[in-house]
Amino acid sequence: MFATKINAIMQHYETLAENDAYDWIRWKDGRTRFSKKVANRFFIGVMLDQGQKAERAWNAAEYLVDNYFNTSEDFWGDIATTHLARIKKICQTGYEGKSFALNYSFNKFPRNLKSSAKLMIEKYGSDPRNIWNVRAENVYQIYDRFLLFPGIGDALAKMAQFALVKNHGVAGGISSKSEMSIKPDILVRRVLRRVGLVSSGQTNVVVAQAREFGLSSPADFDAAVWVIGREYCFKSVPACNKCPIALACDSASV
């Protein structure tokens, strides 16, 4: 029964991968050569991609890096030497009068940003590229390193790893696809619980039980599940009648 459900999800991945609107779901050829500024945008995007739409988070990250903490060539050094009260004002009002972080991250982001600057300077030479500059056999280190930064939990660390390896060819790119595991964000957990692949939506349960799926490419499976969660499997009133895996779902009302 699990095989039927997993196959339905992977079939949806194949459908998505053929659609240019979902080009981010495909594995990219070659490796992206990040400038330091683009690397800073990526890291801030990871920090902000919680409690708000992904599109807003990544646009906000670009705006923050391009418009603040740029009095020197060292973005993280400028953050580290800026008083927390000033950082808080920028973070909560500096995005065209609005906050960069929303909801539960609104008050946490300023302090997390300053603490992250300290860690970035001490361990990675003020350069996020050093976080993911690893060989293919050490792809797991990307996840482990992101997880050490305040405000970046399991799901965000895994998302960062997926994006870097899949979309930017870091750590061997597609050759490392079997060495990763799914990211247990709220959308993925909801879909897996409802479809009947896990017994609970709790993060530790999802992570443990997903290891038993025998996935050849956890990142592809994860991407398809995430899209299903975002576009069909809503928290309230899910669109089961439109869901591409409804026939394989234990909870679908079609």
Feature locations, PLM:
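HhH-family (HhH-GPD) DNA N-glycosylase catalytic core used in base-excision repair
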Residues: M1-V254
